């Protein structure tokens, strides 16, 4: 989801039978690299494959499905804890054995940038001259740290963080599957807190859904758990700035501290609001276009706030 720059060419290669012996999946943490590597293993070893659409019914697909028992021919290695020369030699030796029951013997190496220089050199020969039945999938957040002689043998697919519209679609499908009502104002908070990482964002949503009440997941329930500044407090701060009410602004900061809020978080959220107003001045339909993460029912309020300032005023306040 949201990784078309990877899925489109990779699907075409699988369907055409253009299989390489080493792949490199890179990108920020939590963006789906390792999960995609597992899906690719299913695609490669499906009885009807290699295919971009594994059947999900054959023994290989069932064993590699989420919650499945696993497959002897697909090995996952966490290079953060198994990165030494002996670990790589063992992996290299195993690579020369033919698959027990599948088309390919696949090695998924997570955190591949953590492999030690001596370990990488031990692995190099089998990556350079692999048996026909072996495929390596390296996953890493720092591809530049993988030695060039290995990196040059791979097909490199860069993953990226999800955009807010794509993330909202993912959250809405998850919520629909759970059957829990979630207020529209909750989504922007969860999306921002997740930082574009599907894994982190879904983890936050799962935590919030676990504590949902009879009315579902409301803004008032989610906001304190996420540590986000209340929108009404930000609205008051914007009104104070627009009216150039300096005493009122100092009184508001005192209120933030006395109420137990994090002053640093208040400052960050206020800067984010000023940034949103600057975008709305430049692009009136920014909320609908997904440039500003806010519920659609807040569009008129934010637009009115943006109109109370000139462009230079917002720039000055944000600086």
What are these model-predicted stretches?
Residues 1-156, 174:
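P-loop/Walker A NTP-binding region and its immediately flanking N-terminal helices
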């Amino acid at each position: 989801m949201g990784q078309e720059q990877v899925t489109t060419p990779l699907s075409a290669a699988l369907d055409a039978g253009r299989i390489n012996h080493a792949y490199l999946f890179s990108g920020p943490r939590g963006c789906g690299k390792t999960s995609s590597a597992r899906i690719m293993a299913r695609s490669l070893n499906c009885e009807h494959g290699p295919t971009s659409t594994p059947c999900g019914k054959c023994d290989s697909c069932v064993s590699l499905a989420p919650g499945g028992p696993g497959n002897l021919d697909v090995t996952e290695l966490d290079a953060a804890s198994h990165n030494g020369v002996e670990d790589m030699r063992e992996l290299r030796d195993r690579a020369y054995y033919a698959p027990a029951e599948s088309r390919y013997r696949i090695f998924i190496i997570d955190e591949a940038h953590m492999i030690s220089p001596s370990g990488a050199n031990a692995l190099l020969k089998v990556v350079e001259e692999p048996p026909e039945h072996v495929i390596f999938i390296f996953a890493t957040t720092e591809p530049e740290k993988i030695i060039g002689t290995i990196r040059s043998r791979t097909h490199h697919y860069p993953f990226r963080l999800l955009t807010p519209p794509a993330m909202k679609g993912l959250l809405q499908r998850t919520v629909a599957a759970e059957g829990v009502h979630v207020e529209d104002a909750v989504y922007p908070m969860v999306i921002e807190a997740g930082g574009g990482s599907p894994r982190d964002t879904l983890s936050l949503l799962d935590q919030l859904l676990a504590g949902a009440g009879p009315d579902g997941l409301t803004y008032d329930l989610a906001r304190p758990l996420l540590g986000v500044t209340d929108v009404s407090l930000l609205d008051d701060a914007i009104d104070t700035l627009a009216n150039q009410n300096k005493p009122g602004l100092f009184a508001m900061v005192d209120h933030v501290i006395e109420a137990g809020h994090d002053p640093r978080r208040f400052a960050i959220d206020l800067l984010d609001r000023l940034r949103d107003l600057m975008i709305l001045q430049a692009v009136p339909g920014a909320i609908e276009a997904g440039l500003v993460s806010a519920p659609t029912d807040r569009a008129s309020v934010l637009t009115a706030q943006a109109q109370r300032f000139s462009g230079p005023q917002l720039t000055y306040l944000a600086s």
